[in-house]
Amino acid sequence: MCGVNPSYSLPNSNVFNEALKSLELSVSFSMNNTETAMLSKWVAATPHYLESWGDLEIKSGNYSLIQPTIKPLFDTKQFQDVLLNWIDSNDSYYDYLKLYWNNRIL
């Protein structure tokens, strides 16, 4: 899970929490020790959004790139970089975004 805290925000969080505890593997990517992170088997620190690459669709057909505005504060990896690593990709998330934008948006 990344960028969410369902153990806090869900109205029936007790049901979610019991299900989360029953999983063999649960990973929380978080900047803080949230309620969900505390119940997860693994917690991975994530960088602040000001340290991160990204993109978004502001409204239908209007796209924007997100560029880091500060140097990394700690030795953390962006969630998307971790996912790319897990699928044995040699690309960084920056490279992935660049390729995606060149092939599909620009």
Regions found by a protein language model. Name each.
Residues M1-L106:
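Non-catalytic alpha/beta scaffold blocks inside enzyme catalytic domains
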